[in-house]
Amino acid sequence: MFNNSIHKVSICIALTLTFSANAMAVTEIPFWHSMEGELGKEVDSIADRFNQSQPDYKIVPVYKGNYEQSLAAGIAAFRSGKAPAILQVYEVGTATMMASKAIKPVYQVFKDANIDFDESVFVPTVAGYYTDSKTGRLLSQPFNSSTPVLYYNKEAFKKAGLDPEQPPKTWQELAADTAKLRAAGSSCGYASGWQGWIQIENFSAWHGQPIASRNNGFDGTDAVLEFNKPLQIKHIQLLSDMNKKGDFTYFGRKDESTSKFYNGDCAITTASSGSLASIRHYAKFNFGVGMMPYDADAKNAPQNAIIGGASLWVMDGKDKETYKGVAEFLQYLVKPEIAAEWHQKTGYLPITTAAYELTKQQGFYEQNPGADVATRQMLNKPPLPYTKGLRLGNMPQIRTVVDEELEAVWTGKKTPQAALDNSVKRGDVLLRRFEQANK
């Protein structure tokens, strides 16, 4: 009996050691991101399902603040030897990441892990933003790509005598509609999130105008800014005039206007297509989604939208097993059913052709009118060399400059021309600084 007890104890110890060894064998992969609220919940859900699908790797999502904060945290962590394996970085951080010497290109990650990966699965206009201009190879993996869209309150439109199925197509129509909406009781006619991205960068591309020389920086770091031209000045003047009348309200530099919209304060907002998840969740009224307005007097408009959002960068300095786990997770993200679900639940673009086709086959766009607006904007016309995106060094800082100058317009301290001229002047100083640092 005594021997039998010893035998049972030995079995228990052996099983405990086995389970402990298995637990220790799991490779944890930190994934720093900037998805909060409903978006963060979906990131957690995807990570959990990947973790349950295999026994070797555990993705650990960690929210690290907004895009600017997470980029700064990621670079600082790399310098101290404590970087995550995966870092989500917004699109204007691309040039910074390329020059940082802190990354391992995605194509190299897959190659080293001996995992086949077809880069052609991505929608070309999305992948093109994150590829090496010289080799055409993918440096980071597209994840949450977006374009700006127009959200409008159908009930407010109906109350103002406007057609709730017809959002404004031009900026001139939007200006007229907001006046009617305000007269009908809306405290805020129009507001915009991400003013630099929407009112300067995407406005320029949507009208076939370059943001900078050298094809918006794709052809070299010696680019200069060019968004202080008559069409852009005219547009900011229109917004300034609306602001003085009380028809356009400025709430902040990021996506503050989104909550003002879904709370019912603002009748119209332009915001990221990725805001759709929050608007769906919180809005207690019928709303619609329309394309970005264009200037009625501009020739050949609209052209195409350029993407925002972010991609996933793999940080350098990790071990072989970590990189294999990273490769498997990135491969998991582009499975048609996973990529399609992410697109459908969040409002971000379908990043692969297969995800787009699957979404159509499932009847999602028919059941959710407006859900395909972001995609249609991106594919509206074949992109010109200077409307496929932008790759400018110190772009996060340039956006801050643009924000400061536009805020001077909204407060009446500067004219649109003076603000855009100074934005270009100050921005070019930042471009030259980046160019010198990366020669």
UniProtKB/Swiss-Prot annotation:
Q: Give the range the annotation lists for the signal sequence.
A: 1-25
* Principal location: periplasm
One annotated Gene Ontology cellular component of this protein: periplasmic space
Q: Which InterPro entries match?
A: Bact_solute-bd_prot1, SBP, SBP_1_CS
Query: In this record, what's one Pfam family?
Result: SBP_bac_8
Gene3D superfamilies reported for this sequence: Periplasmic binding protein-like II (3.40.190.10)
Q: What domain of life does the UniProt record list for this protein's source? A: Bacteria
Family, similarity comment = Belongs to the bacterial solute-binding protein 1 family.
**Functional note:** Part of the ABC transporter complex UgpBAEC involved in sn-glycerol-3-phosphate (G3P) import. Binds G3P.
Q: What is this protein called?
A: sn-glycerol-3-phosphate-binding periplasmic protein UgpB
Q: Which organism is it from?
A: Yersinia pseudotuberculosis serotype I (strain IP32953)
Q: What is the lineage of its organism?
A: Bacteria, Pseudomonadati, Pseudomonadota, Gammaproteobacteria, Enterobacterales
The primary gene name is: ugpB
